[in-house]
Amino acid sequence: MTAPLIYIVAGEHSGDVLGARLIHALRAINPSIRFAGIGGPRMEECGFQSLFPMHELAVMGLIEILPRVLKLRRRLQQTVQDIETRRPDLVLTIDSPGFCLRLLRAIQPFGIKRVHYVAPQVWAWREHRVKRFPGLWERMLCLLPFEEKWFAERNVPGQFVGHPVLESGADQGDAARFRARHSLADNARVIVLMPGSRANEAGRLLPVYGETLRLLMQNIPTITPVIPLASSTAHTVRGAVSSWPVQPIFITDIADKHDAFAAAEAALTKSGTSTLELAMGGVPMAVTYRVNRITAMMARRLIRVPYVAMVNLLAGREIVPELLQENCTPTKIAAVLTSLMNNAPDTNGMGAADSQKQALKAVVASLHAPNRHASDGLPSSAAAASIMEVLGQ
């Protein structure tokens, strides 16, 4: 009997991480499973060969995507042809709904089983899109606790398998190890900067981050910025920070990143999954985001949720400050970070950093799924078990 072939499509860094964990979890169930498709460096470490460089799919924003439409269309056609040629037993698409939903629709006539991992965030904006989902997949795997019910109410079966940040190791960092490895002085005050894994979003935020550091240094002269580098943005980041008043520590190792979390007094991050990663590490944070003005104007008309930071959505209130668009200024950001790093009393009389940490613990606890898919409780194992159910194995 031929070993099953699973065709995985991941379009950005976070999807690459999920894909790598899934490959490990699926091989733990059936070591003979074969893989093909599109992925990044983390999946390639598992022996995965990508059809083309994954970073070509990593673009965000209504305006930013326009110059790349033709190339993305060619890559979509190439992927469809590859799937038709290979005839895999199952196609697994991970996040990147702009590309993946078009792909799933295009391969619908092939009769191949399909699973989509990471529910499209139609609950946040353009809810009408949910009407197009029936028939696109046999199963959708949800990361967030409210999604299964939300989609079920709209006749789209989803399955909450837990959030992968729970197995990221973000809560296992060692502050002393980080300080020793990077020869930090005893009075060095660490702040983690996470401008995003897409070059366009990082390019907009880094100048703001640099000026914010300049302001922070007036009151915190020993501030020590740390930037976890993604390969997709390394060139952009290194070029942007050359004029900063203090040069950051660049880290590429995941364990080193988690050690940085443990050593950090605060973090400055873009919105998205990074907020959950920092929450797992117990790092107080401020959330920032900037996009093209036209994109922002259109998004404000379409978005139907009160917050952009995932931790705030899950908490149902603003537990971390959101500094977006016109509020994403060095002066405002520096004021928030100063309050966090000095643990200044908030309106309840609790330290700003301590208050955030307490609220973030509750958010992390909500990310655990019921133990119905995998004995070890890991989200990737639950997702792999669900995928094998679809395969009929």
Curated annotation (Swiss-Prot):
It holds the Pfam family LpxB. Pathway: Bacterial outer membrane biogenesis; LPS lipid A biosynthesis. Signal peptide: none annotated. One of its GO terms (biological process) is lipid A biosynthetic process. Its EC number is 2.4.1.182. GO terms for molecular function: lipid-A-disaccharide synthase activity; phospholipid binding. Keywords: Glycosyltransferase, Lipid A biosynthesis, Lipid biosynthesis, Lipid metabolism, Transferase. Transmembrane segments: none annotated. One of its GO terms (cellular component) is membrane. It catalyses: a lipid X + a UDP-2-N,3-O-bis[(3R)-3-hydroxyacyl]-alpha-D-glucosamine = a lipid A disaccharide + UDP + H(+). HAMAP family: LpxB. Belongs to the LpxB family. Condensation of UDP-2,3-diacylglucosamine and 2,3-diacylglucosamine-1-phosphate to form lipid A disaccharide, a precursor of lipid A, a phosphorylated glycolipid that anchors the lipopolysaccharide to the outer membrane of the cell. This is Lipid-A-disaccharide synthase. It comes from Granulibacter bethesdensis (strain ATCC BAA-1260 / CGDNIH1). The gene is lpxB.
